[in-house]
């Protein structure tokens, strides 16, 4: 396309797909989602999938092909559901006015007494019911999809979550199906019990890093410091 030779970064790529414009708080500039959407989600993942698909095709047809994996294309594909919502009249251009952009009281983050945050994602009725039960809020006061009550619902949730620390709330919701989780920092995430149990992170040479994903039953990933591995040895492992 006309921008193929122009300088740019993740933020620029997703800006022209509608993705960036949908993220952030109402009345404020869009919030950069790190560089996850364009570089990795829209670029690397689609390129990897494209390479695998092209290899499978070559094995079947005997012919190779060029894989054109543009980050703008990939980011646009990631927005497919939201374009469908928009065309069906179910998505507004204004941020924090929709189901999944913080526009609903039961799908957003709330600040806790210690300045931490809890993520609430109780979209389905059964999970919303558990959320209200754990917050000790009468379900009759706040029917889930009564938009006229959402403003008061937000206030009630804010007041509740502000009454305890993040870790206290995490312990309170542990084991429940309220779809509530503590918002952890990069430094904190490796120590979360779920991540520890799954060995989601591993330390190598004093550096904490995520383990490879997805996982394969026949060829599980392992960590090797690679200090004695030369080029020839590395290439031999790929044969």
Describe the role of every protein-language-model region.
Residues 101, 106-176, 180:
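Aromatic-enriched alpha-helical interface/lid elements that frame and gate functional surfaces
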Residues 86-97, 192-204:
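Short, surface-exposed loop/helix-turn segments at secondary-structure junctions
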Residues 4-5, 151-153, 192-196:
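Short secondary-structure transition/capping segments
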Residues 174-196:
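Conserved PLP cofactor-binding pocket of PLP-dependent enzymes
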Residues 1-118, 122:
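Active-site-adjacent "lid/gating" segments in soluble enzymes
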Residues 147, 200-239:
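Flexible, small-/acidic-enriched active-site or ligand-binding loops
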Residues 124-125, 188, 221:
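Short, glycine-/Ser/Thr-/acidic-enriched flexible segments
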């Amino acid at each position: 396309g006309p921008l193929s030779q122009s300088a740019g970064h993740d933020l620029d790529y997703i800006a022209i797909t509608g993705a960036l414009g949908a993220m952030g708080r109402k009345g404020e500039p869009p919030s950069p989602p790190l560089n996850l959407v364009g570089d990795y989600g829209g670029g690397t993942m689609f390129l990897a999938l494209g390479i695998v698909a092209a290899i499978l095709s070559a094995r079947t047809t005997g012919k190779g092909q060029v894989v054109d994996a543009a980050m703008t294309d990939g980011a646009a594909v990631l927005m497919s559901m939201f374009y469908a919502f928009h065309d069906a009249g179910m998505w507004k251009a204004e941020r924090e006015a929709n189901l999944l952009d913080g526009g609903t009281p039961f799908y957003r983050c709330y600040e806790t007494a210690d300045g931490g945050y809890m993520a609430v994602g109780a979209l389905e009725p059964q999970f919303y019911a558990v959320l209200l039960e754990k917050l000790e809020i009468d379900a009759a006061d706040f029917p889930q999809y009564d938009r006229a009550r959402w403003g008061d619902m937000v206030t009630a949730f804010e007041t509740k979550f502000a009454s305890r620390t993040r870790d206290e709330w995490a312990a309170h919701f542990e084991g429940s199906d309220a779809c509530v989780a503590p918002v952890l920092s990069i430094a904190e995430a490796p120590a979360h019990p779920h991540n520890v149990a799954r060995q989601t992170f591993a330390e190598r040479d004093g550096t904490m890093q995520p383990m490879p994903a997805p996982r394969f039953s026949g060829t599980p990933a392992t960590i090797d410091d690679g200090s004695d591995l030369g080029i020839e040895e590395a290439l031999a492992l790929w044969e």
